[in-house]
Amino acid sequence: MRASGILMPVFSLPGPFGIGTLGAEAFAFVDFLARARQTYWQILPIGPTGYGDSPYQSFSAFAGNPYFIDYRVLAEDGWLTPDEVPAPVPVGTVDYGALYNERPAILKRAADRLLAEPSKAYTDFCAAQDFWLDDYALFMALKAEQGQAGLADWPDALRTREPSALAAARVRLADAVDYHKAVQFFFFTQWSALKTYANQKGIQLVGDIPIYVSPDSSDLWTRPELFQTDGQVHLTQVAGCPPDAFAADGQLWGNPLYDWPRHEAEHFAWWKRRMKHATSIYDVVRIDHFRGFESYYSIPAGNTTAAGGKWVKGPDRAFIDAMHEALGQGGIIAEDLGYLTPEVKTMLTASGYPGMKIMQFAFDSREPGNYLPYTYTRNSVVYTGTHDNVTTEGWRATASPEDVHYACRYLRCTPKDLTEAMIAACLSCVSDMAIIPMADWLHLGAEARINTPSTQGSNWQWRLTTPLTSLLADHIADLTVLYDRAPAAE
């Protein structure tokens, strides 16, 4: 079935608390999507973030980001008093440093009220999430006690989970552990309310999970035997990408690599649990770097570049079969961008999952024809660009004149109309699903770029300051109906 949606990170929503939250503005965005006759709201990973602020480097593969908790909703639920809700601040880019300094004290007031007389909803939540929640809360409490040091720099007894050290920590840090559990309860209570509302409005939430966990994560700390470590929770090999025309030294991501034989011996139980959790909070799940299941680039830990790595065979079809067994065959989007071998393409075909198409990549005048829309297949998801691309207006301003000319010739438009023409090309193409970034519908320039890969500084900070009008929603709806992507009218 043909359908469409909009890519909009939660942190990019407007709102009064310095970052997008799960409050009124998120519900208003659902209303906008419904009026625009959309089916999907695609977001970025929603886990807690640390140094660098990347949602793809989270402290947990299961937890939610405390920054997204809406204070107004906490007040409505009785966990904050009205005068404890901070005064509104103007909508600007996300200041993660300010959030780091200001949020914990406010959330602690709410947590203290909850913990003074825990509700049945809270105890039920803790019981349902016990497969990750206790370890995550203890990890975060220990991390604070260690001055926010990374896991690799913790004392040996704590890093390696020596039983006596953990038992003492659970007593010593009991209040902090309870705080982190309460915060997760607040997050998932608000998330559940938003998802319920979205689904009632006919909007499905498309989540995003990184293939790898962070080297500073409760996941690695809790189950180091599932990763390529030395037995002391130090990494032996790390993830990345090999050198190519765009990066002479490759990309050194530094994430832990999975010990796939161990996962296979356990029938991929950890991954099944991860994916079942993801499919419980999202309607559709995009898996980042899907090709890494077929083979992955392995770099010796301690290397300063990715140049010394090598490709290693992954679980391939065994993983796909395990996911089919646990989840069925739908509800997954495979991010299959980058270096694809015939083996990767065979694995993707066997999975039945749709891959991704990026319209901006179609118009490389040096390699004409490779990624043009006529090459797309129905079982795919097409984007003008993703969070890793500049906006289409930004692309028009920064791409080579030859590329812009090529795009305009193909799309039969002038440079001034290129963004709208590229959106129309996405909506009209054969791909079953089309996702357009919100910034492209607004014709915003490079200032609205979400992330520039392999850089630090101003990523993950863009927020929406342009009003989403009924006029824009009706324009989107008109094109959605025109290209037969609108849901059936009730």
Residue spans of the language-model regions?
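Mature N-terminal, pre-catalytic/accessory segment of carbohydrate-active enzymes
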Residues: 1-37
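Alpha-amylase-like alpha-glycosidases and glucanotransferases acting on alpha-linked glucans and related
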Residues: 9, 53-184, 188, 213-435, ...
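Short alpha-helical segments and helix-capping/turn motifs at coil-helix boundaries
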Residues: 24-31, 189-197, 271-273, 418-422
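Catalytic domains of carbohydrate-active enzymes, especially glycoside hydrolases
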Residues: 24-49, 277-282
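Surface-exposed amphipathic alpha-helices with a cationic face
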Residues: 34, 191-199, 324, 348-349
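Domain-scale activation on soluble regions of proteins
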Residues: 35, 158-159, 165, 462, ...
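Outer-envelope exported proteins of Gram-negative bacteria
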Residues: 44, 204-206, 210, 284, ...
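Conserved, well-ordered alpha-helix/loop/beta-strand core segments that scaffold catalytic motifs
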Residues: 180-213
